[in-house]
């Protein structure tokens, strides 16, 4: 951004060229600006071809185009009216060659629409299941390239259609149509937001977690430690934390069972029809951790018939984090944190990167609790052993 610290560093170090973004463009809408296109050019993408395709979609979505012929407006009308009728969980399915599109759509939809108690909850990387594991609160958005279709995945989506679920199919010629899809979905999101009754271009609840995090790191700078907290359950290498209101509700639901499994069962028992379950993992995002967390989310979906989300912190704070705190109070959250096997100092500060991560997790949880969300934090001493224990416990309490 013009005038930022990064510009000052670039000029001081005599960078060959500085590309400026437009401060008026929100980050989630900036894929076709310098923020998206400069890296694309650097990696060898044919940017002219890419932007030519994007321009075709921009013209098709222009204000002079009739609504019924406007692909962005029509998609937005579908998403907005579906959300108002209760189908507010947009499940994103892509062909394997464009799988990362889901993460971009997840941020666009969640950060744009999830506010003032309303919103569309995007669901990314949830495997397609049998029709009977879903409730009636879903819209399935299937985006694929012409030559990237997964036959088995396509057959599962056909089964969902035949069972009466809402399935949108969007076919791209090839990956150079991604820019066109960026534009289509940006227009659609704005239109859907208007129908829902929110401003799609602000993110009022993102800053709340930042403030809570800064308060915690400031406390660390003064005292050399984060404020003390008391677990509600200690069970081997696992500790459970939550706020007073959630603790009281969980203790009542658990009855005399004060174990990890007892509280976990009580927490998952708070998931009702129309809710969604979100795993908020402040741990390393690697294949092994993703695999076990995916197993957990699918176990919850298949048993509870609710939408499930999986986000790794702190990155989800700037995407789905907005909807979790500002959107409808229909989420049940399980935050996962762990001790750091290795930590690094932050230059010029007393705190370490591990402390910053812990403060981000605690700060976000604090705001979830302040917003009256159903939330429980699982802290693992050993992340790998702890995840295995957590997965086994989830399977057991859902049985």
Features from the language model and the residues they span:
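Phosphate/diphosphate-binding loops
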Residues: 146-165, 169-171, 200
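Ligand-binding clefts of soluble mixed alpha/beta catalytic domains
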Residues: 165, 175, 190, 194-200, ...
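Extended C-terminal subregions enriched in glycine
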Residues: 149, 276-308, 312-318, 325, ...
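A generic structural motif
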Residues: 20-26, 112-127, 166-176, 303-315, ...
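Glycine-rich, charge-decorated loop segments at or immediately adjacent to ligand/cofactor-binding or catalytic sites
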Residues: 3-15, 176-183, 311, 317-324, ...
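C-terminal amphipathic alpha-helical interaction region
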Residues: 202, 207, 224-228, 266-279, ...
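Short conserved micro-motifs at the rims of enzyme active sites and ligand-binding pockets
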Residues: 103-104, 135, 151-155, 179-181, ...
């Amino acid at each position: 951004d013009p005038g930022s610290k990064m510009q000052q560093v670039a000029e001081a170090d005599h960078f060959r060229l500085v590309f400026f973004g437009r401060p008026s463009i929100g980050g989630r809408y900036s894929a076709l600006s310098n923020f998206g296109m400069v890296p694309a050019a650097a990696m060898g993408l044919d940017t002219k071809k890419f932007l030519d395709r994007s321009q075709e979609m921009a013209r098709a979505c222009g204000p002079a185009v009739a609504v019924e012929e406007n692909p962005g407006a029509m998609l937005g009308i579908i998403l907005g009216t579906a959300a108002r009728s209760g189908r507010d969980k947009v499940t994103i399915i892509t062909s394997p060659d464009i799988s990362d599109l889901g993460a971009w759509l997840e941020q666009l939809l969640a950060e744009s629409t999830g506010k003032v108690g309303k919103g569309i909850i995007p669901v990314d990387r949830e495997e397609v299941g049998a029709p009977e594991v879903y409730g009636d609160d879903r819209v399935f958005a299937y985006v694929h390239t012409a030559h990237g279709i997964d036959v088995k995945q396509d057959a599962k989506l056909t089964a969902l259609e035949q069972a009466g679920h809402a399935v949108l199919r969007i076919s791209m010629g090839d990956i150079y149509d991604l820019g066109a899809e960026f534009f289509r979905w940006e227009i659609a999101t704005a239109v859907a937001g208007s129908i829902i009754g929110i401003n799609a271009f602000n993110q009022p609840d993102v800053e709340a977690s930042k403030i809570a995090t800064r308060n915690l790191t400031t406390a660390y700078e003064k005292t050399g430690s984060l404020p003390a907290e008391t677990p509600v359950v200690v069970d081997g290498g696992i500790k459970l934390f939550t706020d007073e209101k959630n603790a009281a509700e969980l203790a009542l639901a658990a009855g005399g069972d004060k174990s990890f499994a007892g509280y976990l069962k009580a927490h998952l028992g708070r998931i009702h029809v129309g809710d969604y379950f979100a795993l908020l993992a402040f741990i390393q995002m690697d294949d092994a951790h993703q695999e076990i967390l995916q197993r957990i989310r699918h176990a919850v979906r298949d048993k509870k018939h609710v939408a499930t989300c999986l986000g790794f912190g702190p990155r989800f704070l700037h995407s789905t984090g907005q909807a979790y705190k500002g959107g409808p109070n229909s989420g049940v959250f399980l935050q996962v944190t762990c001790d750091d096997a290795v930590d690094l100092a932050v230059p010029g500060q007393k705190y370490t990167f591990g402390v910053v991560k812990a403060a981000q997790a605690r700060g976000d949880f604090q705001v979830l609790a302040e917003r009256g969300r159903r939330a429980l934090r699982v802290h693992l001493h050993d992340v790998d052993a702890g995840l295995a224990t957590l997965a086994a416990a989830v399977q057991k309490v859902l049985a």
